[in-house]
């Protein structure tokens, strides 16, 4: 390198260092000024282009950041650093086909890079292509076999696909790595519920809520299972806690009415069924018809036959 080129390189490095210092302190505009100064010396300098892309990304200007990473990719032919950033940027923008194109290129060049299988899995989940998502997650797990967040994602997909035994094995692996993972316990309870293992499902769901009391939605699952298990007082306790947080959940109110029925609090049950039936915002026709039929059954038991028959007839109204 001759003297002039050496001076030019040092000037560029000085501007890049200054830009990095400014960017590190959040002064992105000043950082960009230094980088533009460096570009006047060498417009297509790869280091300047890369740092400029990073600064623009941090500043939130995704379009311009992407432009510089693409420019660097074109100049260099192959830039792994640019590919990694292009994957993230196009994914955030929802341009999944482009993301997959960059993923394919990066995965050929750097197999251990987690970005490729991770984003690929998320895209296939978005597309509803769950088998392909599983393949991508398995690629990821070859690199990091004990990463519980990825194992959880895999277990959830297996559950969606109805592969419940495999999903349960996956959750059990998570719990062998991290026994206090509240979401994994919730997932286990949900899967066991689908497998018909009520007692084990309840144990798992209660463990989840003990580990993280903010998982309020779990109260509803527990209430449903306690109801199915004829533990009505327990069911009442959990559904009440749930409805304190989500008072407008109509399905949960329906469970509450069923619980009241089984506790012989028929007046309370009837009030809830009437509210569900008269609620114009309820779109679930099955829930409305079930409420009408349950109301009719109660009226029949109370000896109010004429009112019961009238209510039964409403259940067969096609306008419901």
Swiss-Prot record:
Keyword annotations of the record: Repeat, TPR repeat
Spans of repeat TPR: 12-45, 46-79, 80-113, 114-147, 148-181, 182-215, 216-249, 250-283, 289-320
InterPro entries xref list: TPR-like_helical_dom_sf, TPR_rpt, Ycf3/AcsC/BcsC/TPR_MFPF
The keyword Repeat appears for this protein: yes
Protein name as annotated: TPR repeat-containing protein MJ0263
Species this protein is from: Methanocaldococcus jannaschii (strain ATCC 43067 / DSM 2661 / JAL-1 / JCM 10045 / NBRC 100440)
